[in-house]
Structures are given as structure tokens and as C-alpha cells.
Amino acid sequence: MPRAQDVAQSDATLSSPATPASYEAAMAELETLVASMESGELPLEASLAAYRRGAELVRYCQQVLERVEQQVRVLDGDALKPLAGEGTNEQGGA
């Protein structure tokens, strides 16, 4: 069955180690997965594998961002402040 072998090979190329090396590596892999899925050239099984891997990467990125946000809260006295020009004016609001 050559088709099953092709699917297994494409699954292997889409499957990377479970944990990315960094946030940036996860984002780069996500961009690659999205581009390959948007091309419409992946077989159904490979698209499903890419979707699953993408979901894993999104979860990883969310966890990293949550950890960084927690660190910022600790460093900033548990009160997140908006960046200047985002949502409020630079003079402190209302």
C-alpha cells in the first residue's frame, strides 16, 4: 500500500518533538504548518496531523505567555500596567 506509506512519511515530517526548543521555534513551526495547510496540497490525514501539532504548539505558546505574564506581575508588584499608548493615555487614564 504505497498510499499508507506516503501518509506515514508525511505524518513523520509533520510530527516534531513534543516540546519546542523555544517560543520562537514554536511560532516558526506554527507558521510553517499553517502555510502547508493553506496550500491545500496536504492529504487529509496529513492535514489532521498538522492540525493536531498546531493545537499542541498553540497550547505551548499560551503556557509560555502565561508564565511570562506571571513573572511580569511578580516583578511589577502584581499590577500589570498597559504599555504607553495602549488602551489609556500616557498620563494615567480617565
From Swiss-Prot:
Subcellular location: Cytoplasm
Family matches, as InterPro entries: Exonuc_VII_S, Exonuc_VII_ssu_sf
Catalytic reactions on record: Exonucleolytic cleavage in either 5'- to 3'- or 3'- to 5'-direction to yield nucleoside 5'-phosphates
Keywords in alphabetical order: Cytoplasm, Exonuclease, Hydrolase, Nuclease
PANTHER family: EXODEOXYRIBONUCLEASE 7 SMALL SUBUNIT
Function: Bidirectionally degrades single-stranded DNA into large acid-insoluble oligonucleotides, which are then degraded further into small acid-soluble oligonucleotides.
Homology family: Belongs to the XseB family.
Assembly and binders: Heterooligomer composed of large and small subunits.
Protein name: Exodeoxyribonuclease 7 small subunit
Organism: Ralstonia nicotianae (strain ATCC BAA-1114 / GMI1000)
Gene assigned in the entry: xseB
